[in-house]
């Protein structure tokens, strides 16, 4: 099986490529240098030349707060870029897996979110990822939409690395304590995605590790495990963030 993977310089795409190799599958990885997903002609050319059996689309604009000031580029990447890929998958009649986000919900539920719950994004990032979901649903019959949250891995930037770096230069930090989620290791997630892409169980899914916590609780555990003496104080997200964010994405 030949699997085409976008965003391979990111933490999830990197682990997906490694997992494909472990399972004896052929992975064809690209990032923006090899294929600009906002360029429809280039997307068409590169994917058709690769002739894959499936596409795992990990590439995305993920800077949530920055998206509020860069709506056009965020939409080009997350919505138009996804649609460009979806149209090629439709033409080739191949599987497509789209990595989406918990930000397509409003975060105000009182129970864990189900894959088919109403999508009601609160910010630009969530809205553009929602538009990406609509694009794949419109164009691709064999689609997987996999919503992930709070990911961390060896490659790329993530919350753990940010906290550890801040802990080297700060004795005291404030971290939001009114957003809950499930920290998810991209190594585990990649194994699930590669297993899924080999099936025909199409549809929408949520994929995270078990357990829930707040960002504040996560930060406290990070410093505890690292043996770093850093004081962490809880704070409301409205004091730190410029964009509306879901409070509960468990």
Region spans (language model):
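N-terminal Rossmann NAD(P)H-binding glycine-rich loop of SDR-like oxidoreductase domains
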Residues: 3-19
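NAD(P)-cofactor binding segment of oxidoreductase domains
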Residues: 69-97
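Single conserved hydrophobic/aromatic residue that forms the stacking wall/gate
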Residues: 241-250
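NAD(P)H-binding glycine-rich loop region in Rossmannoid oxidoreductase-like domains
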Residues: 41-77
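NAD(P)-dependent short-chain dehydrogenase/reductase
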Residues: 134-181, 187-188, 195
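Mid/C-terminal beta-alpha module of Rossmann-like enzyme folds, strongest
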Residues: 192, 199-240
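Adenosine-cofactor binding site in Rossmann-like domains, unifying the SAM/SAH pocket
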Residues: 27-42
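Catalytic helix-loop patch of NAD(P)-dependent Rossmann-fold dehydrogenases
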Residues: 76, 81-84, 104-146, 151
């Amino acid at each position: 099986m030949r699997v085409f993977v976008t965003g391979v310089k990111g933490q999830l795409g990197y682990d997906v490529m490694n997992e494909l190799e472990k399972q004896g599958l052929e992975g064809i990885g690209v990032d923006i240098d090899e294929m600009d997903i906002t360029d429809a002609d280039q997307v068409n050319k590169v994917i058709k030349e690769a002739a894959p059996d499936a596409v795992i689309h990990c590439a995305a604009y993920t800077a949530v707060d920055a998206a509020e000031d860069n709506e056009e580029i965020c939409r080009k990447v997350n919505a138009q870029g996804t649609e460009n890929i979806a149209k090629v998958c439709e033409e080739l009649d191949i599987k497509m897996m789209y990595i989406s986000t918990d930000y397509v919900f409003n975060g105000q539920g009182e129970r864990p979110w189900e894959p088919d719950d109403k999508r009601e994004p609160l910010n630009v990032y969530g809205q553009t990822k929602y538009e990406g979901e609509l694009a794949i649903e419109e164009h691709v019959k064999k689609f997987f939409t996999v919503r992930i949250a709070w990911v961390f891995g060896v490659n790329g930037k993530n919350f753990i690395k940010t906290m550890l770096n801040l802990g080297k230069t700060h004795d005291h930090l404030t971290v939001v304590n009114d957003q809950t989620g499930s920290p998810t290791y991209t190594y585990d997630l990649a194994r699930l995605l590669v297993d899924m892409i080999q099936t025909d169980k199409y549809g929408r899914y949520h994929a995270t590790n078990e357990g829930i916590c707040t960002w504040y609780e996560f930060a406290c555990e990070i410093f505890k495990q690292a043996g770093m003496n850093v004081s962490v104080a809880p704070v409301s997200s409205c004091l730190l963030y410029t964009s509306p964010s879901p409070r509960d994405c468990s």
